[in-house]
Curated annotation (Swiss-Prot):
Similarity-based family: Belongs to the bacterial ribosomal protein bL33 family.
Any one of the GO BP annotations: translation
Annotated HAMAP family: Ribosomal_bL33
Pfam families: Ribosomal_L33
GO MF annotation, one: structural constituent of ribosome
NCBIfam families: PRK00504.1 (NF001764), PRK00595.1 (NF001860), rpmG_bact (TIGR01023)
Keywords: Ribonucleoprotein, Ribosomal protein
UniProt key word Phosphoprotein: no
Protein name as catalogued: Large ribosomal subunit protein bL33
Cellular component, GO, one term: ribonucleoprotein complex
Alphabetized PANTHER family for the sequence: 50S RIBOSOMAL PROTEIN L33, CHLOROPLASTIC, LARGE RIBOSOMAL SUBUNIT PROTEIN BL33C
Amino acid sequence: MAREIITLACTECKRRNYTTTKNKQKHPERLELRKYCKWCRKHTIHREVK
């Protein structure tokens, strides 16, 4: 299967808040999205973690 499940972690508090899928063959770089962190109570950058 080409799509793999990844986890997104907040860059400020380091908590893993979101899971999503991506095609690692088409996009090998790490994903970065601005999403809401309920522990920081604000929108922060969330990065893909292993």
